[in-house]
Regions:
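FAD-site-proximal beta/loop scaffold in flavoenzymes
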Residues: 5-24, 114-182
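Cofactor-binding loop segments of dinucleotide-utilizing enzymes, especially the Rossmann-like FAD-
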Residues: 31, 56, 166
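Acidic donor-binding helix in nucleotide-sugar-dependent glycosyltransferases
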Residues: 37, 55, 182
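A Rossmann-like FAD-binding core segment of flavoenzymes
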Residues: 47-151
C-alpha cells in the first residue's frame, strides 16, 4: 500500500510540474507558511507564470509568531516577483478542477472578485496525518489529527511513547526546525 501511495504521489507531482510549465496563471489558496513557500518556489522555477495568492485572513502569514517586519519583507518580495496578493477574501466555491491539474477555470471570491487561472493549489487547512496510529490513539487525537503530549513530549496515556513535530498538539508554528528542537 505504501508503494502504491508513493507512486501516486510521484505521478501527481509530475503532472503538476508539467502543468506549471504551461500555465499562464496559477492560483494558490492560503498565504500561511506553506502557501508563501509554494509561491516562492513557483515564481523561481516558472518565472513566466503569473501567480495569485489568496488569503482569508487580513494579512499573509496569519499565524502568530511572525514579526511584522518579516511579514512586510515577505510582502515586498512577493510584490517584486509580480505576485497578486489578495487578503481578507475567500473563494465562494472551489475551482471545478482538482488541485495541480492544468485546466483553465474561473472562480469568484466571496467579495465578488473574479479570478482566472490555469491551475491551482490548496495551501490551507492542514491536518496531521496520524490515522496510521489506529484506534488506540483516538481518545487523545484532536479534530486536526494532532495528538496530546505532555510537557516532555510524552504521548498522554501511552507510557514509553514520545512524539515530535507536526503531530503534537504543542502550540507553535509547525516547522522543521521546531521538530529538530523537539528531538534534542
Amino acid at each position: 500500500h505504501l508503494e502504491s501511495s508513493a507512486a501516486l504521489a510521484r505521478a501527481r507531482i509530475e503532472r503538476a510540474h508539467a502543468g506549471l510549465e504551461r500555465a499562464g496563471r496559477v492560483l494558490v489558496v492560503g498565504a500561511g507558511d506553506v502557501g508563501v513557500e509554494l509561491v516562492g518556489e513557483i515564481t523561481s522555477a516558472f518565472p513566466g507564470a503569473g501567480v495569485t495568492l489568496l488569503e482569508a485572513c487580513a494579512r499573509i502569514l496569519p499565524n502568530r509568531g511572525y514579526l511584522p517586519e518579516l511579514r512586510r519583507s515577505i510582502a515586498d518580495q512577493l510584490e517584486r516577483r509580480g505576485v497578486e496578493v489578495i487578503t481578507g477574501d475567500t473563494l465562494a466555491w472551489l475551482p471545478p478542477v482538482d488541485p495541480g491539474v492544468l485546466s483553465p477555470f474561473r472562480v469568484t471570491t466571496t467579495k465578488g472578485r473574479r479570478l482566472e487561472a490555469d491551475t491551482w493549489f490548496r495551501a490551507h487547512g492542514a491536518s496531521a496525518a496520524t490515522g496510521f496510529l489506529g484506534e488506540d490513539y483516538d481518545e487523545i487525537r484532536h479534530y486536526d489529527g494532532t495528538i496530546r503530549v505532555d510537557e516532555h513530549l510524552r504521548v498522554v496515556g501511552h507510557p514509553g511513547v514520545w512524539a515530535i513535530g507536526d503531530i503534537t498538539d504543542v502550540r507553535e508554528t509547525k516547522r522543521a526546525d521546531a521538530a529538530r528542537a523537539h528531538a534534542r
